[in-house]
């Protein structure tokens, strides 16, 4: 790589940003009074426990060695598994929604019309078509949670039936 010589001076990074050991000529030296980059006083470092620029501060995590550890219960059979799964479903907010509140003022015809209004009328042929179509649908393996893979269809139906019965037996508080 060739160096271009202009007026006896070489141009390169060492000339643009000279180091402290080189002498600066009169046209290259800093003017008086501009020794610092800014006229402001150097900023003081913030204390470790002090608030940051947005008002946030460091909050240390609990380091106690006597922390409670969660023990996983061994997987049981039947009702234990169903109860455990029901608890998980409720904790995740995946439980069935509350049934609509029934008014005592409604007459039977109005209630029947309301129930029929929310359902789609289908003949038995159409019902079978929907069942076959839904049976052909499969979710990808990562889309199915581990607890759902552990349940058989019969166990899942039992969970749903128990949840429905519990809702029907529970008094309407709302």
UniProtKB/Swiss-Prot annotation:
InterPro entries with a match to the protein in the record: MEA1
Tagged with keyword Phosphoprotein: yes
Organs and tissues of expression: Highly expressed in testis. Transcripts can be found in primary and secondary spermatocytes, and spermatids, but the protein itself is only detected in spermatids. No expression in Leydig cells, spermatogonia, or sperm. Very weak expression in the heart, kidney, spleen, thymus and ovary.
Acidic residues bias spans: 38-48, 65-78
Location of region: Disordered: 1-78, 94-122
Sites bearing Phosphoserine, chain numbering: 103
Taxonomy, superkingdom: Eukaryota
Key words of the record: Developmental protein, Differentiation, Phosphoprotein, Spermatogenesis
Free-text function comment from the UniProt entry: May play an important role in spermatogenesis and/or testis development.
PANTHER family linked: MALE-ENHANCED ANTIGEN-1
Full protein name: Male-enhanced antigen 1
Organism: Bos taurus (Bovine)
Lineage: Eukaryota, Metazoa, Chordata, Craniata, Vertebrata
